[in-house]
Amino acid sequence: MTTIPRNFVLLEELESGEKSTGDGTISYGLESPDDILLSSWIGTIIGPQNTPFDNRFYSLKLYCDKDYPNKPPTVRFTTKINIGCVNQQNGVVDPKNLPILSNWTSKNRIQNILSELRREMSSSSNKKLVQPPEGANF
């Protein structure tokens, strides 16, 4: 089995993020255009309709270390959010509590993580949680 080099995978993800494919509820790209290692990413999720997250904008930071895509990136919300997989002190997504991170394969991508987090917002257990005021940050 051929392994695709890390930078090729990340360049493909960058191109995909810049094209903004999908329904517009998630977006992502490099935090800095000068990041030649393609390590630090930012993402945005628009909360799902008919949930406490409805039309709120959630910002995240993702860090892809040298082992990406063989290991998942670290993911941290910068916008305060109350869902089961997010540490309420620092916004870090706990890999053990988000299936895409706990069952990571090298075929998963940043877009998949953001989509999975958006789906988590719609889960019945998370829909019941009281949310911080809009615009609050970690």
Swiss-Prot record:
SMART domains listed in its UniProt record: UBCc
Cross-referenced InterPro entries: UBQ-conjugat_E2_core (IPR000608), UBQ-conjugating_enzyme/RWD (IPR016135)
GO terms of biological process kind: postreplication repair; protein K63-linked ubiquitination
Keyword vocabulary terms for this entry: Ubl conjugation pathway
Pfam families: UQ_con
Domain UBC core span(s) in chain numbering: 5-138
GO cellular component, one term: ubiquitin conjugating enzyme complex
Gene3D superfamilies with a match to the protein in the record: Ubiquitin Conjugating Enzyme
PROSITE patterns: UBC_2
Protein function: Has no ubiquitin ligase activity on its own. The ube2v/ube2n heterodimer catalyzes the synthesis of non-canonical poly-ubiquitin chains that are linked through 'Lys-63'. This type of poly-ubiquitination does not lead to protein degradation by the proteasome. Mediates transcriptional activation of target genes. Plays a role in the control of progress through the cell cycle and differentiation. Plays a role in the error-free DNA repair pathway and contributes to the survival of cells after DNA damage.
Subunit-level organization: Heterodimer with ube2n.
Record-stated family: Belongs to the ubiquitin-conjugating enzyme family.
Protein name: Probable ubiquitin-conjugating enzyme E2 variant
Organism listed in the record: Dictyostelium discoideum (Social amoeba)
Gene label: ube2v
